[in-house]
Amino acid sequence: YTDCKLAASGLGEEAESSEQSPSPTQLFPWMRPQAAAGRRRGRQTYSRYQTLELEKEFLFNPYLTRKRRIEVSR
């Protein structure tokens, strides 16, 4: 594919040098880790039984109240 492109443009090696990709080590501001204001909570793991109960609840209501989540988690 590059040979066809180079032959069509007639620029030879100059065409390849103009198509440089950014350096893989370059960090953009949005890529830098953010300092957390506080500690993040860890991921909650559920047993098979709890997962089954949650799935049954989600069939009726996809948004559980805090109280209902606590009941299901016991």
From Swiss-Prot:
Ranges of biased composition (kind: Low complexity):
1-24
Pfam family, any one: Homeodomain
Q: Per the record, which residues fall in region Disordered?
A: 1-28
| Localization annotation | Nucleus
Main location per the UniProt record: nucleus
CDD domains assigned: homeodomain
Q: What are its GO cellular component terms?
A: nucleus
Q: Give GO terms: molecular function aspect only.
A: DNA binding; DNA-binding transcription factor activity
Matches recorded under Gene3D superfamilies: Homeodomain-like (1.10.10.60)
**Which key words tag this protein in UniProt?**
Developmental protein, DNA-binding, Homeobox, Nucleus, Transcription, Transcription regulation
DNA-binding region of this protein: 39-74
Extent of motif Antp-type hexapeptide: 27-32
The record's function comment reads:
Sequence-specific transcription factor which is part of a developmental regulatory system that provides cells with specific positional identities on the anterior-posterior axis.
Family recorded in the similarity comment:
Belongs to the Antp homeobox family.
What this protein is called in its record is Homeobox protein Hox-B8
The protein's organism comes out as Gallus gallus
Instruction: Report which gene this protein is encoded by.
Output: HOXB8
